[in-house]
């Protein structure tokens, strides 16, 4: 029985696969998704910090936090959802935790995350 579910999930993941860049908690993301209001459909952009990532095959998801008008908003997105259009990494953050739920209580400068720098090794002669 579990093999049937596993095969079904793998098939659905291949059908719903999208080009999503690799990102980690602490990274600033720009998520574009479809919103359906009755009969009309529009595209909305949600920019914020990734505070968690959940890798569970077809049920994989990630949470993004942004501050709007002084209020903290956390939105959960499913990776294989047909409503998800694209994800862009705008800035890479340096954090030491996998889940950054403590950021929800912080505002302003206290909620800042340092930028992660990547170094390229030079080939020696």
UniProtKB/Swiss-Prot annotation:
Q: Key word Ribosomal protein present in the record?
A: yes
Molecular function (GO) terms for this protein are: structural constituent of ribosome
For this UniProt record, the keywords arranged alphabetically read as follows:
Ribonucleoprotein, Ribosomal protein
GO biological process per UniProt: translation
Q: What does this protein do?
A: This protein is located at the 30S-50S ribosomal subunit interface and may play a role in the structure and function of the aminoacyl-tRNA binding site.
Q: Which HAMAP family match?
A: Ribosomal_bL19
Q: What is this protein called?
A: Large ribosomal subunit protein bL19
Source organism of this protein record = Wolbachia sp. subsp. Drosophila simulans (strain wRi)
